[in-house]
Every structure is written in C-alpha cells, then in structure tokens.
Amino acid sequence: MRILVTFAVEAEFAPWRKRHGFTRIEIGIPQRNTNQTSYEVYEANVAETDVDVLLTGIGWEDLFHNVAHKALRDLLKRKPDCCVSTGLAGGLNREFRSGNIVAASQLILREGGGMILSNKKLLKVAESCGAKVADTLITERHIVSEASSKSAMSKFGDFVDMESYHILQVVSGTQIPAIAVRGISDAVDRDVPLDFNKVLDHDGTVRKRRLIEEIIRNPLRIPSIIRFGLQSSQASRAVADFLVKFVSSLANYDGRVAASAYGEVAAR
C-alpha cells in the first residue's frame, strides 16, 4: 500500500519525521519558469505502508510558478491508495481547542468556488483514530490572526487553513481518495500573537529581522508568543500521534481505501 501525505512546512512534519526513517529525495524540475529547479520528497515505510511526504509551503502560489502543484501531480503518478492533507489549522468552531485533531467533511475557498468532499471511508478511519469530524474547512489566502476575524468566519466553517482545498482539488481529478485532517493550533477566541504573514517565508523560514521588529514593537506579547509556540508544537505532536494510528489502520484495508466510492472526492 502507498499513501501520499502533505504538510505545509517542516515544523509541522518534524514530530512524525523523527519517529520514522524518512529519506529525503531531491527531484529535478525540467523547463520550469521558476528559480526553483527541484523539489524534495520524503520517503519511508510506515506500518508496512510506503509513505511519500511533500512539503507544499505555506499557502498556494500562482499556478504558473507553483512548484508544489507540479510536485503533487508528479507524486500522484505513483498511484497512491490515498492522499492526506495535514498540518496545522486555526479553529473557528468553539468546540475545537488547541491540540484537537479535526477532519473535514467538505472544503471551500474563502473567496468562493465549488465545494470539495473528503472521502467518506477515510473520514470513518480518521474518526476511529481519534479525529473529530467537522462539516467545513475553509482555505484562506492568508493566516487569520485576529479572534474577531475568526469569529466572523465561523459562520461559514469550522476551521481554516491555507492549502487543503487546493491539494484536494488537484487530487480530485485522479479519483484517488483524499482527506483533509488538521491539528488545531489556535482556538477561535484567541488572537495569534504575531502577524505571521509578515514574519514567515513561503517555506516556513522565520524572517528574523521582521520577527525582532515585531517583538520590539509589541514586547508585552512575548508571553503570548511563547504560549502560541508551545501550543503549535503540541498540535504538531498530536498530528504525529494521529498519523501513527491512521496509517496503521489504513494498512488493514485491501486495495484502495475507497474502491467502492471513487467519485466522492470531487468538486461540485
């Protein structure tokens, strides 16, 4: 069995990576209109399952320059039995607290567009492994930092990220079963203490000068920044714990997880 797992950045992947012997593979990109000439894939055998991990970066860049889109399409040619979009997300539903693992029944874009569904069998497996199943995951263009903004968005969804809709949209054209499962880093009633849109690069690298400037501008936020960092680390470890159970559970299935439900992961 083979599965494809996507995270946005290394920090989200790190707790799971440490538990298994993932090998980093660099794959070249021929004739691309971008400064990036390759992408990295991490490979391991987990619970008798071949696992490919792709780090997509934060958000989803313009398609013309989107290396993650190219990499995802390449990895789907390996015919994985399913695809999992995971990592961290912000909570919109008051029932979800930091560290909760939440799976999305459906995904929408903040700016509108068609709805995408997670695979029903994968949702059942995720729930059996401890995930809470929510109605709607919203994919946004930027990190939603303010509690007031999250509260306003809660009318339309239960949690928010920046990648999952785009990932499942690409996968939907292949009829490979897919699911979005995220760890909650910040609850709906909590401000994110920094504007991470300013201090993080696309690959998750911290812009140290910007970070220092933000801290100097708001020194009273230092305790909140530390607390948020600890919560994010806890949520990433919770994702790793979930994936251990999830991959082991998938290994109990023969053939494709959704052999009887190929049309479920589709935009409508």
Spans of model-derived segments:
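Glycine-rich anion-binding loop/nest that anchors nucleotide
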Residues: 7-8, 83-87, 178-188, 247-250
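Glycine- and other small-residue-rich loops at beta-strand/loop junctions that grip anionic moieties
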Residues: 56, 181, 228
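Regulatory input/activation interfaces that engage signals or partners
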Residues: 184-260
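Alpha-helical scaffold segments in soluble metabolic enzymes
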Residues: 15, 74, 125, 170, ...
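Conserved active-site and cofactor/substrate-binding residues in soluble primary-metabolism enzymes
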Residues: 7-11, 62, 66-67, 117, ...
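Metabolite-binding pocket within alpha/beta catalytic cores that recognizes anionic/polar moieties
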Residues: 1-125, 133, 158, 173
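Acidic, Ser/Thr-rich low-complexity intrinsically disordered segments
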Residues: 261-268
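Active-site rim beta-loop-alpha module in soluble metabolic enzymes
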Residues: 116-200
